[in-house]
Regions:
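Catalytic Walker B motif of ABC-type/P-loop ATPase nucleotide-binding domains
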Residues: 156-160
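Conserved ABC ATPase signature
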Residues: 131-135, 139
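ABC ATPase NBD coupling module
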Residues: 55, 67-88, 114, 126-130, ...
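Helix-to-loop junction immediately C-terminal to a conserved catalytic motif
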Residues: 51
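ABC ATPase C-loop
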Residues: 148-149
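The feature captures the beta-strand-to-loop junction immediately N-terminal to the Walker
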Residues: 36-38
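Conserved structural motif at the start of ABC-family nucleotide-binding domains
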Residues: 6, 20-21
């Protein structure tokens, strides 16, 4: 059996005296894996802990068999994890092309270059001279993903990539995730929208109150209203074609 690309063992973390993550364990290879859960269940804290932005209080994180918990965010990124956080975090005055060229140094001969990003997202190529503030929400998210790809990491971590986006733009991101995996890049997707999460990844880890409560498949999750209600606080809106979103929980961290 081959070694997992990412392995998380008994990971806990929090803020001050408040524990948010509680004994998280999972592993993944070169695949797309979804972390789905209601708002406030600790999903963003998991992302930030994996990236070294929040200190782990216990447990281990291994990437390619090497422990990376305790490293700075810069060292985690150099180890091979690329992060697309919530909020997109673009520069309003820089053009699309300037955003990409800023990170293009050293990409010659690697899989992801600015031209490869434009090929993945043709809409960005059409808007390459537009400033970050002039882009639509969907275009900003494409740019945020494309900019991250230029780091040429072995694992891309996406936090709520479908947030605020029209279904047609979500479809573009779904296609991008599938292509990344097909070309050898692992993707860990954190989502609370059921349809987006299950379209991006067949394997789903359900997060409740800072713990991985269940592992299931996208197929099973879409087809099981009881599972949706129990873990996500939603009904069977998926049957009507609506975009079910996990109900928020009070007093918890995202």
């Amino acid at each position: 059996m081959s070694e997992p690309l990412l392995e998380v063992r008994g990971l806990s973390s929090g803020y001050g005296e408040s524990r948010v993550l509680d004994d998280i364990s999972f592993s993944m290879g070169v695949e797309a894996v979804g972390i789905i859960g209601r708002n406030g269940m600790g999903k963003t804290t998991l992302c930030d802990t994996l990236m070294g932005l929040v200190r782990a209080t216990s447990g281990e994180v291994l990437l390619h068999g090497q422990r990376i918990e305790g490293r700075t965010p810069e060292k985690v990124a150099r180890s091979g994890i690329s992060y697309v956080p919530q909020g997109r975090r673009l520069f309003a005055s820089l053009s699309v092309d300037e955003h990409l060229r800023m990170l293009a140094k050293g990409t010659r001969g690697k899989r992801w270059t600015p031209d490869a990003v434009y090929e993945l997202f043709p809409r960005l190529a059409q808007r390459r001279s537009s400033g970050g503030a002039d882009l639509s929400g969907g275009e900003q998210q494409m740019l945020a993903v494309g900019r991250t790809l230029l780091l040429n990491g072995s694992l891309v971590l996406m936090d709520e990539p479908s947030e605020g986006l029209a279904p047609t733009i979500v479809d573009v991101l779904v296609e991008a995730v599938h292509r990344l995996v097909a070309e050898g890049t692992a993707v860990l997707v954190v989502e609370q929208k059921l349809l987006a999460a299950t379209a991006m990844a067949e394997r789903q880890l359900v997060m409740v109150s800072g713990r991985i409560q269940a592992e299931t498949t996208a197929t099973q999750l879409r087809a099981d209203p009881e599972l949706q209600r129990r873990y996500l606080g939603v009904g069977s809106a998926v049957e009507t074609g609506e975009q079910p979103t996990a109900a928020p929980a009070k007093g918890r961290h995202a």
